Design a protein with these regions (language model features):
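Residue-level detector of alpha-helix boundaries and kinks
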Residues: 3, 13, 80, 118-125
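Short, well-structured hydrophobic secondary-structure segments
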Residues: 49-51
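Hydrophobic ligand-binding cavity/cleft-lining segments
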Residues: 1-46, 154-155
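Hydrophobic-ligand binding "helix-grip"
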Residues: 29-33, 37-44, 54-103, 109-111, ...
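A short acidic/glycine-rich loop-to-helix N-cap element
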Residues: 109-132
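Short amphipathic alpha-helical segments
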Residues: 14-20, 128-132, 136
């Protein structure tokens, strides 16, 4: 399985606020063009939810349904695909305090389920996933930059 980690720092937003925005899946389509649709079912007895996603992916759309498990005290969300276009898609979001705001870490493991083309397709899918996560975070949180790097100065 291909592993992807994206760490971005959101400027001027505290971790609790960032976590609440990232947890509010229903708002994604109105805040970023990358996510075309999200349907969230009512919470299950254990607090997890099932959500159905339609996301722009290169020149097409990827669709999947996932189980999302929220950990507000840790400001983290774990997800696992239940069905959809990936063979496997699972990972997490985490929000941590940073002197200038919040560092958001997105981790995912995925398998497109086409072993004979994995060497060609996986790097493209990884790049697209990284770009999509950055666009999603910009839409949700505003100014973001790769963790550890300062945003570009304009003047």
């Amino acid at each position: 399985m291909r592993q992807v980690t994206v760490r971005m720092t959101a400027q001027g937003i505290d971790p609790e606020h960032a976590y609440r925005r990232i947890s509010d899946f229903r708002r994604y389509p109105e805040l970023t063009t990358t996510v075309r649709a999200v349907e969230v079912q009512p919470p299950r007895p254990d607090g997890s939810v099932v959500s159905a996603w339609t996301v722009a992916f290169r020149n097409g759309l990827m669709r999947w349904t996932e189980r999302d498990t929220f950990s507000p005290a840790a400001r983290s969300i774990a997800f696992e695909q239940l069905s959809g276009d990936f063979e496997t898609f699972e990972g997490s979001w985490a929000c941590e305090a940073h002197p200038e705001g919040t560092t958001v870490t997105f981790r995912a493991a995925f398998d497109l389920g086409i072993p004979t083309l994995a060497e060609i397709l996986d790097p493209v899918a990884e790049s697209t996933l990284r770009t999509n996560i950055e666009k999603i975070l910009q839409g949700l949180l505003g100014t973001v930059s790769p963790a550890g790097l300062a945003p570009a100065a304009h003047g």
